[in-house]
Amino acid sequence: MPCRYVIDTEHGLVISTAWDRVTFDEVNAHQNRLAEDPSFDPDFKQLVDATKVTDLEVSIEEAKKIFGRKTFSAASRCAFLGKGLVILGMGRLIEAQAALFEGRESVRVFSDRQKALKWLGMENLP
């Protein structure tokens, strides 16, 4: 499965990484595993690293379902890190959904890891 996560409980951060071809079912399974992990706290921040994704098989409706799950709390922030028009475009869709439904900036898209970490307040992490 081309999705994994690491929970950094010390810093309150989940780093989700995806690579190669990623499908809706794989993203959904990733969220299920994360939500069931005893180390997970919905208030943690998240960095989604999709820089190595080559093909994203997630429709707009499926992306809405993914975001609609609310795995993370309303207090959480998510930085989506990607490369390429399709991947960044999907990130922008999620960013717009968050702004529309939550009325605040809880998701932001980046192409630079250090800028993403800084936005999350984690600029001192490698």
Put a short name on every predicted segment.
Residues 1-126:
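Amphipathic, Lys/Arg-enriched alpha-helical "gate/interface" segment within cytosolic domains
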